[in-house]
Amino acid sequence: MFPQAVFDSDDTLTNRVEPLGNYRTIRLKPYEKPYGDIKTMKKHVNESTWITTDLHTTSGESRVSKVISTINDRVGDEGHLLILGDLGKASLSANMTRQYIESVVNSIKTKNKYLILGNHDVYSIDDYVQMGFKFVSDELLVPWGKIKIRFTHIPIPVNKDTVNIHGHIHGSNEYWYTTRRHHYDAYIKWDEDYVTHHGMTSQVQEGFPAIQQLGELFKYYDHERCD
């Protein structure tokens, strides 16, 4: 389905921003600008938006193909997909070619693809735009009723009226968390293992959430935390 992943010592990823080995710092630098219109994104990120993260396309073609198939079945040709980082997985000894990652991205049918950069997303913003993403940034903050949702790759502390939805967690439980500053009782573990990282088994079996499936969670914050 995808071209063979090529690891080449001459592939230096010269377009990387602030490389740390083969990793990047996630915060954008002054000379880097997010791509895409924030106002438009606030309209697109709604109850029918689908979310996934940490695809780590180096984890094996068979597993990646199954995940892409699941995405295409759920999102369809016209749906909206927000990816919370880590399309690939770089290492200190080898780089995955841009061609392979682009082929995986292009196999996702919908043209409405948006990317929040992860620590393994080592290419430039322009590269990800050329791959077909309509929005590329280090984070996205959208209003949601009485609260705000802050989408990031790495979990960050947020104010009491904000929910942080993120990827990146590589703990043994492998669950998404919503994080809130100074509200330790409000750390909520989602019922399904939507962030599956390298194995992806649960993601293939269980799928991944549309924001509409989080309604009870947001209702909880609306009424219990923001009044």
What are these regions (language model features)?
Residues 2, 46, 78, 145, ...:
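Alpha-helical hydrophobic/aromatic positions enriched in membrane-embedded helices and signal peptides
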Residues 11-14, 18, 40, 75, ...:
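Low-complexity, compositionally biased segments
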Residues 11, 18, 26, 212-215:
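Intrinsic-disorder/low-complexity peptide segments enriched for small residues
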Residues 129-227:
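Conserved beta-sheet core of the metallophosphoesterase superfamily
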